[in-house]
């Protein structure tokens, strides 16, 4: 009989007896002991008796054959009544008991979805709401940007026909189950209502205190801030060309790695770009931690991308005063957004009161919005200052215009009734901005200035193109990426912004995407911004809208300064200009023909078009040298000062004039 079975390990006799005791308790119940349940107890009893090692914890028991979740839970009473101090320390949930004298409280990781949900629930319920619904909570948590990952399901995941796996349908909302199991959130009613428990409110407060966040208000405009009590904190902050918002205090990693681990020849690669050794070492540390690769020689390109992204995601430590009534100081965690652009600053006078200083340090969320130029040549930066819409003499922009964000109606989040449209509406209320949806001839979003009384609309010098990682990969492969960038550059905007959603490291074309972003920013003058998903992108639009308004807000029409200066085009003229750019011209056809010639690159084709915009004009030039074939073959090379190589010059001549 099983009752008389010998226990191999004497220390397990008590556990074996406890299994038999539980079996007897179930047998004495009115329903009795079912055949399956009896078999389960017998199997578990035999396994305990045959175990050669002592079973001291529930974790040890779970590894014994015959003890599933139900049996382990049933045996918990035995371990609770045993020698608690030694046994409980070995349980996974209680290993911290040696230091904390008890079970460690569950606290979500900083910038995780659980972290964002707890703080969002805490703020809303503190401000008078008793509970929040699921979709309301998802939209609010997505909008506040406290989570690095999207809270709701991302569009494009779990597409029909591609296998409905759990991984495809997983979203950040899944962590709500953990919060409920840990006793931090209570779910009730149908449809569900979510409320914080007393412990959940304590954990939310602890998260807020650890990260330096304010208790309630996320975003404040400059007009809503009272600089007087903050003057003691951080001087020399200028709100004229920036909007302000509460920001998390930067996390300082206590670990420090030796600078000598990076070879000097690798460090010297970053010197021409103006980066300090400390910046390079810190970037190497972050990149190597994320990739697992510790070899500096293979990481330097990724580090360069990381440093450039750090410049884009920067906060401005200080700005110059331009107006007496707007020179209030602000806290160090208030975000500043630079709209002038680092290239333009190099060529502008330091006495220009409207100039913003370059950003040197800041948080991972701050936006140095627009340093783009229409050409990669740095000398063009001097003309890269955004234009003003028409103003009467002495009239400020704030008195005459409102800034409105225009989204392309072909974007998914512009569809009525979609979840993303609810996020758009939430962004409107959260940032107190106006958003409209229209058909745009180029780009995914622009900003217009609408006259408060005349209702006339003028397009401001800012345009953004948005792509997720999958779209980026496909557009690179079919050359749409190159064509779209060219359309943006030809559209006449001063500030070009490219937003990439998602992590390229998870794509099979990761290196191609990183290289494309690198060249787009470094060589072509775009501002490349990275976001984690649609919610953060819309939030980024909100930041840019506020900062653009603050940049223009106090600009005044001064005849002495605005003589000969171009003004912003009207919305109708902008649409017409873009439509005209789409029309195929004779020069465009000629350029396509030239690109089919061997040895002719894009630069060579452009050089030919600069001198001879049509095939007829080039043929006419050849006709003047008809008697000298050698001179005809060398004509393009000589007249372009060797920009066009000899082989290309000869091949073009054969195309146009050859027999």
Curated annotation (Swiss-Prot):
What positions does the domain ERCC4 occupy?
404-503
PANTHER family linked to this entry: CLASS II CROSSOVER JUNCTION ENDONUCLEASE MUS81, CROSSOVER JUNCTION ENDONUCLEASE MUS81
Q: Which cofactor does it need?
A: Mg(2+); Ca(2+)
Q: Which GO terms describe its cellular component?
A: condensed nuclear chromosome; nucleolus
Its recorded name reads Crossover junction endonuclease MUS81
GO molecular function terms listed in the Swiss-Prot or TrEMBL record: crossover junction DNA endonuclease activity; DNA binding; metal ion binding
E.C. number: 3.1.22.-
Motif stretch (Helix-hairpin-helix motif 2): 585-622
State the deletion phenotype: Sensitive to the mutagens MMS and MMC. Increased sensitivity to gamma radiation. Deficiency in homologous recombination in somatic cells but only after induction by genotoxic stress. Decreased pollen viability with morphologically aberrant (small and misshaped) grain. Moderate reduction in meiotic crossovers. The double mutant mus81 send1 exhibits severe developmental defects (e.g.
Domain of life, per UniProt, equals Eukaryota
Q: What does this protein do?
A: Interacts with EME1 to form a DNA structure-specific endonuclease with substrate preference for branched DNA structures with a 5'-end at the branch nick. Typical substrates include 3'-flap structures, D-loops, replication forks, nicked Holliday junctions and also intact Holliday junctions with a reduced efficiency. May be required in mitosis for the processing of stalled or collapsed replication fork intermediates. Plays a role in DNA repair and in genotoxic stress-induced homologous recombination (HR) in somatic cells.
Compartments, as annotated in UniProt: Nucleus; Nucleus, Nucleolus
Primary residence: nucleus
Q: Where is this motif: Helix-hairpin-helix motif 1?
A: 59-78
Could you say which protein family the record assigns here?
Answer: Belongs to the XPF family.
Q: What induces it?
A: By DNA-damaging treatments such as MMS, cisplatin and gamma-radiation.
Q: In which tissues is it expressed?
A: Ubiquitous but preferentially expressed in young flowers buds, notably in anthers.
Additional remarks: Two distinct classes of crossovers have been demonstrated in Arabidopsis. Class I is MSH4 dependent and exhibits crossover interference. Class II is MUS81 dependent and exhibits no interference.
Q: Which GO terms describe its biological process?
A: cell division; DNA catabolic process; DNA damage response; DNA repair; double-strand break repair via homologous recombination; homologous chromosome pairing at meiosis; mitotic recombination; telomere maintenance
Q: Name one Pfam family in it.
A: ERCC4
**Main EC class the enzyme belongs to:** hydrolase
Record keywords, A-Z: Calcium, Cell cycle, Cell division, DNA damage, DNA recombination, DNA repair, DNA-binding, Endonuclease, Hydrolase, Magnesium, Meiosis, Metal-binding, Mitosis, Nuclease, Nucleus, Repeat
Q: How does it assemble?
A: Forms a heterodimer with EME1A or EME1B.
């Amino acid at each position: 009989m099983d009752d008389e079975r010998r226990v191999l390990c004497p220390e397990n006799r008590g556990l074996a007896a406890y299994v038999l005791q539980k079996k007897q308790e179930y047998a004495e119940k009115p329903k009795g002991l079912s055949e399956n349940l009896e078999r389960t107890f017998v199997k578990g009893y035999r396994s305990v008796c045959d175990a050669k090692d002592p079973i001291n914890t529930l974790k040890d028991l779970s590894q014994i054959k015959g003890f599933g979740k139900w049996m382990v839970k049933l045996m918990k009473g035995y371990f609770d009544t045993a020698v608690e101090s030694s046994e409980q320390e070995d349980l996974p949930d209680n290993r911290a008991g040696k230091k904390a004298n008890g079970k460690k409280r569950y606290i979500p990781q900083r910038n995780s979805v659980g972290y964002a949900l707890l703080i969002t629930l805490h703020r809303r319920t503190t401000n008078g709401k008793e509970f929040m619904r699921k979709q309301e909570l998802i939209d609010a948590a997505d909008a506040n940007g406290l989570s690095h990952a999207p809270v709701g399901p991302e569009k494009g995941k779990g597409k029909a026909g591609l296998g409905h796996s759990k991984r495809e349908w997983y979203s950040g909302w899944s962590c709500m189950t953990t919060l409920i199991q840990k006793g931090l959130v209570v779910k009730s009613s149908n449809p569900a209502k979510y409320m914080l428990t007393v412990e959940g409110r304590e954990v939310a407060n602890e998260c807020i205190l650890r990260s330096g966040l304010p208790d309630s208000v996320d975003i404040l405009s400059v007009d809503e801030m009272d600089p007087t009590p903050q003057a003691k904190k951080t001087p020399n902050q200028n709100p004229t060309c920036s909007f302000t918002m509460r920001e998390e205090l930067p996390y300082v990693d206590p670990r420090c790695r030796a600078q000598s681990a990076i070879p000097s020849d690798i460090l010297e690669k970053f010197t021409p770009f103006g980066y300090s050794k400390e910046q390079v070492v810190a970037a190497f540390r972050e990149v190597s931690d994320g990739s697992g690769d510790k070899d500096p020689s293979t990481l330097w390109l990724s580090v360069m991308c990381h440093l450039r992204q750090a410049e884009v995601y920067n906060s401005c430590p200080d700005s110059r005063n331009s107006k007496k009534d707007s020179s209030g100081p602000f806290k160090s965690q208030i975000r500043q957004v630079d709209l002038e652009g680092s290239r333009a600053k190099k060529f502008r006078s330091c006495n220009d009161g409207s100039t913003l200083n370059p950003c040197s340090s800041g948080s991972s969320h701050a936006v140095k919005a627009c340093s783009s130029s229409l050409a990669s040549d740095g000398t063009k930066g001097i003309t890269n200052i955004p234009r003003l819409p028409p103003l009467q003499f002495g009239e400020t922009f704030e008195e005459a215009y409102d800034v409105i964000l225009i989204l392309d109606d072909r974007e998914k989040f512009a569809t009525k009734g979609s979840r993303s449209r609810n996020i758009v509406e939430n962004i409107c209320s959260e940032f107190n901005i106006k958003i409209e949806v229209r058909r745009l001839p180029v780009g995914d979003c622009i900003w217009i200035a609408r006259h408060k009384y005349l209702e006339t609309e003028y397009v401001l010098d800012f345009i953004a193109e948005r792509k997720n990682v999958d779209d980026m990969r496909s557009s690179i492969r079919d050359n749409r990426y190159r064509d779209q960038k060219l359309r943006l550059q030809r559209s006449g905007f001063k500030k070009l912004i490219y937003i990439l959603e998602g992590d390229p490291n998870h794509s099979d074309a990761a290196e191609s995407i990183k290289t494309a972003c690198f060249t787009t920013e470094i060589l072509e003058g775009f501002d490349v911004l990275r976001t984690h998903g649609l919610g953060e992108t819309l939030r980024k639009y909100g930041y840019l809208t506020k900062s653009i308004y603050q940049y223009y807000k106090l600009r005044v029409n001064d005849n002495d300064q605005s003589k000969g200066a171009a003004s912003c085009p009207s919305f109708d003229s902008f649409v017409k200009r873009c439509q005209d750019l789409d029309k195929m011209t004779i020069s465009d056809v000629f350029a396509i023909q030239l690109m089919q010639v061997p040895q002719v690159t894009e630069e060579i084709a452009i050089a030919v078009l600069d001198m001879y915009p049509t095939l007829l004009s080039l043929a006419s030039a050849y006709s003047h040298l008809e008697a000298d074939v050698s001179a005809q073959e060398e004509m393009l090379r000589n007249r372009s000062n060797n920009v066009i190589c000899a082989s290309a010059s000869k091949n073009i001549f054969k195309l146009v004039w050859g027999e």
